[in-house]
């Protein structure tokens, strides 16, 4: 039974409402039905530079900014005179998700002002070399190239096939990137795994004593750049397709080598596979891992950095939310790609000839897993 705390419901948003299970479920359902608004507002805010603007101001003065002040400080000054009003509407949504802090002030008339919350630092465009940034991840996930694949989800369930291929003329993701320089650059800028690597290096000791470290599918080489900055004695080999290396900068102690991990892998006494295996089927993973195994000395290892899915889909578990969100991203973006459980990683290690695998430590949403020869 519900309890009415005031005589009637009205248009006054401060009027308490009937509290009961059905009402709570209804509110949750409405929130889910309109959930598309938040990620799209988040994406636009990142593209506009809102978080960088607010965070820079908070770092200097710890002060709040009005929407008009925010608009005037954006990297691109809006030509639209109504921009502050629109920014205010966007920011109050972000405030409801605790991404920014909102307060009301009276300066002639009452208005809302905003300040960055600590979580904003994970979304700063200019923070990739510091802790890594999720800004590019949001932007690429909601780029039209990936959005178009979601429209194929129902048909893939009913008829089979590959969501990405259905949306893009039968092409696979990594083949497509070779034809779209804009999207390839955007994809290769996704930088939060740098934060994962830096966090892991705070506790992971597995690179001590390594002489030659090969990053298989290393993209632009930023992972090896981080590792060799801590272990300058290591010779790093950043191994990837030619199109991926085209945008790779120079890092001290790192050599960029072009090739195909499905054909062979450069020799090293340790290797990294960072967020590579989740792109591929079990069969393809075994091919990659067997090539790594062949190029390792006895007692060599592959350092696998991957998300590990929980065995149960527990309600309210943030790790489960992240794991299964990302699993669905793999479902739509990579044919046969998926996130895996501990048991599935152990099975891959065994099928590829490794003696065992061990789950060493966790950094944010990823585990550091050693596949030992």
Swiss-Prot record:
Purpose: Involved in indole glucosinolate biosynthesis. Catalyzes methoxylation reactions of the glucosinolate indole ring. Converts the hydroxy intermediates 4-hydroxy-indol-3-yl-methylglucosinolate (4OH-I3M) and 1-hydroxy-indol-3-yl-methylglucosinolate (1OH-I3M) to 4-methoxy-indol-3-yl-methylglucosinolate (4MO-I3M) and 1-methoxy-indol-3-yl-methylglucosinolate(1MO-I3M), respectively.
Record: active site: 278
Q: What is this protein called?
A: Indole glucosinolate O-methyltransferase 3
Identify the taxonomic lineage of the organism of origin.
Answer: Eukaryota, Viridiplantae, Streptophyta, Embryophyta, Tracheophyta
Q: What superkingdom heads the lineage? A: Eukaryota
| GO molecular function (one) | protein dimerization activity
Cite the annotated pathway.
Answer: Secondary metabolite biosynthesis
InterPro entries from the UniProt entry: COMT-like (IPR016461), O_MeTrfase_dom (IPR001077), Plant_O-MeTrfase_dimerisation (IPR012967), SAM-dependent_MTases_sf (IPR029063), WH-like_DNA-bd_sf (IPR036388), WH_DNA-bd_sf (IPR036390)
Q: Tell me which Gene3D superfamilies the record gives.
A: Vaccinia Virus protein VP39 (3.40.50.150), Winged helix-like DNA-binding domain superfamily/Winged helix DNA-binding domain (1.10.10.10)
* One GO biological process term: callus formation
Q: Which family does it belong to?
A: Belongs to the class I-like SAM-binding methyltransferase superfamily. Cation-independent O-methyltransferase family.
List ligand-binding residues for S-adenosyl-L-homocysteine.
217, 240, 260-261, 274
Annotated transmembrane regions = none
Entry's PROSITE patterns? SAM_OMT_II
Q: Which keywords accompany this UniProt record? A: Methyltransferase, S-adenosyl-L-methionine, Transferase
Give the EC number(s) listed in the UniProt record. Answer: 2.1.1.-
